């Protein structure tokens, strides 16, 4: 064969377009019809500095207000001293309010969007969005590579540990 000519037996796709086969995910990955995305949703509970307190991962076909209930139960066990929780409008509803009331003396406040048709920073919601952006900078969390939801939750925790360690080690 002449030099520079591809081998006829090599049927692979060119670099950059090659796809690896993935085994079937053991945990179900649903489809969120509202956002038109498949995969999983990550619910995070953060403090006022944006540091992770708790994380819960579930298939995307479960509504946000239903996915918040296990997160609230988990957080109540770990952090009984929390008094107030600020949440997105997706967590509005009786189920979430009842779950927050059942866990103790928590006050659940839904942060509403303003009626203006332009971008407005909502301070309480911005804390969580900023934390999710910090977490998504990690390669393993930029896309859904994992087969188990608990593995995704573990990588979210690791990403936050890495971020906090960098901040602690930073010289003033």
Where in this protein do the model-derived segments appear?
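Basic, amphipathic alpha-helical segments enriched in Lys/Arg and hydrophobic/aromatic residues
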Residues: 97-98, 103-105, 110, 117-172
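Polybasic low-complexity intrinsically disordered regions
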Residues: 1-105, 109-113
């Amino acid at each position: 064969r002449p030099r520079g000519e591809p081998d006829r037996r090599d049927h692979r796709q060119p670099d950059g377009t090659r796809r690896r086969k993935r085994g079937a995910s053991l945990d179900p990955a649903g489809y969120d019809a509202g956002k038109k995305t498949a995969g999983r949703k990550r619910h995070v509970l953060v403090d006022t500095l944006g540091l992770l307190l708790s994380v819960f991962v579930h298939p995307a076909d479960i509504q946000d207000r239903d996915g918040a209930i296990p997160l609230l139960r988990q957080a109540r066990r770990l952090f009984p001293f929390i008094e107030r929780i600020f949440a997105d409008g997706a967590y509005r509803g009786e189920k979430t309010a009842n779950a927050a009331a059942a866990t103790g003396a928590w006050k659940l406040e839904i942060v509403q969007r303003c009626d203006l048709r332009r971008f407005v920073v909502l301070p309480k919601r911005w804390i969580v969005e900023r934390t999710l952006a910090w977490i998504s900078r990690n390669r393993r969390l930029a896309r859904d590579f994992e087969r188990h939801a608990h593995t995704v939750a573990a990588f979210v925790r690791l990403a936050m540990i890495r971020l906090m360690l960098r901040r602690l080690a930073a010289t003033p």
